[in-house]
């Protein structure tokens, strides 16, 4: 029996994923599922460039802006939610289209994940309160005594990984890295994934990054982050690592001008986009890569989407503009 197909549309930030995925879903009876780790948070739809309300009224969107940044979230929790949504969409006779750029989520969904035990809410609270009280260096020192292996692999400045490693050891009595050596578990082995990687020419990508950031800064991201800063204490928004948050907080604290905050965010966004492209090129082998160097070529991708739904040798699509490899 032929496996049902799931589409993953991935690529760097500001590469056109949202627009292309939306048009694709409208044309081919699809529903969209988020596969971006920052777009799950409900407090930050603007800074994370989440789909607009107009988009959401045209077709169903799932797993966007549903979670508070004060809540703990993990790749395993995401996978369970995504698997449930995928099966529901297929049961309705529709096509699941996952859109995003978080490599860990994509890799875990397609190739399997390390089954690390769930952390109790009490332990999560204790770990965060401890970190808030003693800071990164002292928490790293505690981790080194408990789990030298994890401490040797985690930078003292990596707050989220430090807390996570501490939680896992306290919960299980084992290093988080011990779970990485076990066979990976597949959550959707009964389905076939077709991965489409959007890889715009770098100059064009950097231009779209700049345009998006200017729009985001003008359309409410400052107020969005100011509200979070007003309502929450810092330990409550450790999860919020979207590019631009740190820079806007620095502006709100009077440490950067608005122009400097925008400039710093643009630099960090370009670096982030470059890392994403490198990751997708090197880590996802079985994929269709679509290259384009301007908006017109990006839009033309919609013309070849029907061909991508058909099982075929990838060489057949190589001569179709935009370039497919």
UniProtKB/Swiss-Prot annotation:
InterPro entries: Dimethylallyltransferase, IPT, P-loop_NTPase. It comes from the Bacteria. It is an enzyme of class 2 (transferase). Transmembrane segments: none annotated. The keyword Magnesium applies. Residues 36-39, 160-164 are annotated as: Interaction with substrate tRNA. Its cofactor is Mg(2+). Monomer. Catalyzes the transfer of a dimethylallyl group onto the adenine at position 37 in tRNAs that read codons beginning with uridine, leading to the formation of N6-(dimethylallyl)adenosine (i(6)A). Its EC number is 2.5.1.75. Substrate binds at residues 13-18. Keywords: ATP-binding, Magnesium, Nucleotide-binding, Transferase, tRNA processing. HAMAP family: IPP_trans (MF_00185). This is tRNA dimethylallyltransferase. It catalyses: adenosine(37) in tRNA + dimethylallyl diphosphate = N(6)-dimethylallyladenosine(37) in tRNA + diphosphate. The keyword Glycosyltransferase does not apply.
